[in-house]
Amino acid sequence: MAQASKGPKSTSYDAYFENVQSRKMLPQSLQETLTAAFARIPVSSFPEVPGGKVIEIPADTSIGDAVRVLSESNIMSAPVRNPDIEYTTDWRERYLGIIDYAAIVLWVLETAGVAAAALSTGSAAAAGVGAGAAGTLGAIALGATGPAAIAGLTVAAVGAAVAGGLSAEKGMAKDAPTAADKLGEDFYKVILQEEPFKSTTVKSILKSYRWAPFIPVATDSSMLSVLLLLSKYRLRNVPVIETGNSSIRNFITQSAVIHGLERCKGRDWFDCISANPISKLGLPFMTPDEVVSVQSDELILEAFKKMKDNQIGGLPVVEGPKKQIVGSVSIRDIRFLLLKPELFSSFRVLTVKDFMNTIASAIPHTGKVIRPLTCKPDETLGSVIHALASNSVHRIYVVGDDNGVTGVITLRDVISCFIFEPPNFFDNYFGFAAQEMLGC
């Protein structure tokens, strides 16, 4: 029987991994031995999420309630469950995808932008923007301070609420990055009462703001399958389904794997690979021309648009023709836009540089823009892993002697250094259903 032709996503996955394998200058025997070892380790051996229970969000949950769940559970993302299916052994029927906090806040900003545009042209009805959205978010996005803004949420209320409310404001007095990482307890208290939040469900934005499919593995699956999904197949997290049951038992993220690798320091196989300079491993797996960056004088919304369009989580902020790095922004930094009401009211004209400076001014003792995480081509993979794990970040930028950005190393890239895909592993292990969901 003829083999089905591969789709564009499959070709992209293959091209990435083939590039990785061709650039790694490691003994083939070492790679085969290590890959075989990962293939024998069951997923059930990986540490469980804190508390031992994976938090799930029903698809008919409102955006406000979803944020409340994420906030109270201190997590950034959660599987979305189909509330219409109570009892089933088929995970395809039970789960619809994964929602994360950054996607929700991105939706908030885009909703505000649409409402503001509608208000500025007097065409809210024609644009299909509800009275709540236009009167509240739109007025705030335009910087209104009169009755229109007061009739909805006040500027201060939205700024504080979306940023994380009192928790974030208290955190700002200590450390701004920490504040941005705390979801805050008051966000949901405000948006539960306002449109379009209280009538918009998680299901309605799940498809448009989902960057990766929902592909679980079984508890008796191998860690190799998880590592391949998190690297070659570009997933950021992999749900673990209990065998014979559709319930999720664990939730393995790229970050968790990197922290796991960091704890392997001292083991022969890890030290053998991590002692190599990143250049010997072919890192970064891109050319300087392929780096997606943003100039410091561009609008901050353009930076977030580039992230969404390219499905990447962060960008280096550069200046000049040599692209000298002066900072970085990530999709999670959207929350910083909302830490201060004056930022939110002017976000449509705010430059990346002003955005970074405003954040820096709120950080005690320094008052300076936080230096982005960088490395040189001669640094070891071990030092890169340590930097990523200890700073809890998702990427590190490779720079030359002139501090110009020459590449980016992501968690996906690091995981790819330790494995390769055995022949026909994907076809034999995951089967057609997973191929279809991955878009292969």
Question: What are these language model-derived features?
Answer:
Residues 1-440:
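Tandem CBS (Cystathionine beta-synthase) repeat/Bateman regulatory domains
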